[in-house]
Amino acid sequence: GLGDVYKRQGLLRVSESQKWEPRFLFNIPLAIQLMVFFEWYVGLQNLHLEDALIYKTKTWKQVWADAAKFRKKARRQILKDYVFFPVIAGPNALPVLAGNAIANVIRSLWSSAVIFNGHFTEDAETFEADNVENETRAEWYLRQIRGSSNFTGTDWLHILSGNLSHQIEHHLFPDMPANRYSEVAPKIK
């Protein structure tokens, strides 16, 4: 993964190695917003909105074109959760709508906690983009290990986190079924 590589400063200051700027005074409210709407931010992440907003290396027309898949998926989910299910619930439409909204926020909070705990810990290192351009395959594997962190807990925690408590193994073997991460974790350690 490239989650540990900083081409430019991100939304949040997640490491002491990132130079402090006054905009980082908003880290806490921005982090809360990111957690509540995590599913949408994940969907928008690959659009690189900062390229149009800040760096001016992309036009809004390009962003709109790049967002076609995201818009289609978002439209389907919004219609399903906030129109279809409430409508078929009839007189219970409002509780269903509220329940779907609450469930989506809870899922976003949980997902963000799992992802943040695997990527932005004291032990996880960050790397500058120019340091990884010509890295060897061995250096890539080492960066995957050094750029993420595992967290421990009960079997239920591993199940409820989709086994992403084994973030290092997830980065090393992204195609491996998640339930196998715990088998290879001792060998990686």
Segments predicted by a language model, with ranges:
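Short, small-residue-biased leader/transition segments that mark boundaries at the very start
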Residues: 2-6
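Membrane-embedded and juxtamembrane structural elements of multi-pass membrane proteins
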Residues: 11-15, 26-33, 156-171, 179
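Histidine-centered catalytic micro-motifs
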Residues: 1, 115-123, 165-176
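Cytosolic-facing loops and C-terminal tails of multi-pass membrane proteins
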Residues: 132-163, 167, 186-189
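Hydrophobic transmembrane alpha-helical segments that form the core helix bundle
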Residues: 7-144, 149
